[in-house]
Amino acid sequence: MPRAFLVKKPCVSTCKRNWSELPDEERGEIYVPVSLGFCPPQPYREPEPSVAEPPSCPLALNMSLRDSSYSMAPGPCVVAQLPSEDMGHLTDPQSRDHGFLRTKMKVTLGDSPSGDLFTCRVCQKAFTYQRMLNRHMKCHNDVKRHLCTYCGKGFNDTFDLKRHVRTHTGVRPYKCSLCDKAFTQRCSLESHLKKIHGVQQKYAYKERRAKLYVCEECGCTSESQEGHVLHLKEHHPDSPLLRKTSKKVAVALQNTVTSLLQGSPHL
C-alpha cells in the first residue's frame, strides 16, 4: 500500500474505523474526519495535558475515568459518517484534537452538484455521483452474470469482462504517442503520460472524451462506429461482434430518422 494512503495521525481513542481506498487512478483524495466505530482496544499511552471534556460516548467512558485529561468531542458515539455541511466544523485544527482520527479517503474527481457524497453501505467507499455508486454496487453481487470464455472467471459488469479478456487476447488499443508503450485502458495511458512524460490532460471532468471503437479480434481502432462496422465486415465477417454492432448501428440509425421526421413535419 502506498505510504500516502496510511493514517497520518495515531489514534488516541480506544477504537477507530478505517475507510477503504478506491483503486481507480482517476480519483482524487480528501481528508475526512472519522468518528468512532468499533475496533480492538489500543495499548494505553500517557496523553499530553489538555482541558478535559466529559465524553458522552459509552465506549470512551472507561478511558475518561482512567485518565482525566482525555478529551473527546461531545455527542453520541456513532459509526463513521460522510462529510457534509454540518460536519464542516470538524475539519478545522481545533477539532482535530478532540478524539477524531483523520484518515485518507479517496473519492472521485469533480464536484457533485449538491456537494454531498454517495456512500456504499457495504464497504463505505464514497462517490460524487449516484451513477458511479450504482455501478460500484455490482461488485458486491454474488452472482457473476458475465463469464470469460477463456478462463471462466465471472464479472458483474461487461466493461470489467472486456478489460479482463484483453489480458488473454493481448489487445492494447491505447498507444502512447511519445513511446512504444500500449495499454488496455485509457486511464492507464493517461497515468503513463502524466508520470513518465509529464503530460497533463486538459479536458474537464464532465467533458466527454472522443470514444475509440476497438476491435476485440485484432485490436484495430476506429474513430467512428461506421468505420468499426466496415472493419468487422471486411476482416471478421464471421465474428459475433459484427451482429451485435450491426444491431446497435441499426437502432442508432432508426432513432436518427425518427428524430428528423418529428422535427420536420413536412418530410
Swiss-Prot record:
Tagged with keyword Metal-binding: yes
Tissue distribution of the protein: Expressed in fetal kidney, and also in adult pancreas and placenta. Not expressed in intestine, peripheral blood lymphocytes and ovary.
Chief localization: nucleus
GO cellular component entries: nucleus
GO biological process, one term: negative regulation of meiotic cell cycle phase transition
Any GO molecular function: RNA polymerase II cis-regulatory region sequence-specific DNA binding
Keyword presence, Glycoprotein: no
Cell compartment(s), UniProt: Nucleus
Keywords, ordered alphabetically: DNA-binding, Metal-binding, Nucleus, Repeat, Transcription, Transcription regulation, Zinc, Zinc-finger
Signal peptide segment: none
Zinc finger (C2H2-type): 118-140, 146-168, 174-197, 213-235
Function: Putative transcription factor. Involved in hair formation and spermatogenesis. May function in the differentiation and/or maintenance of the urogenital system.
Protein name according to UniProt: Putative transcription factor Ovo-like 1
Organism name: Homo sapiens
Name of the coding gene: OVOL1
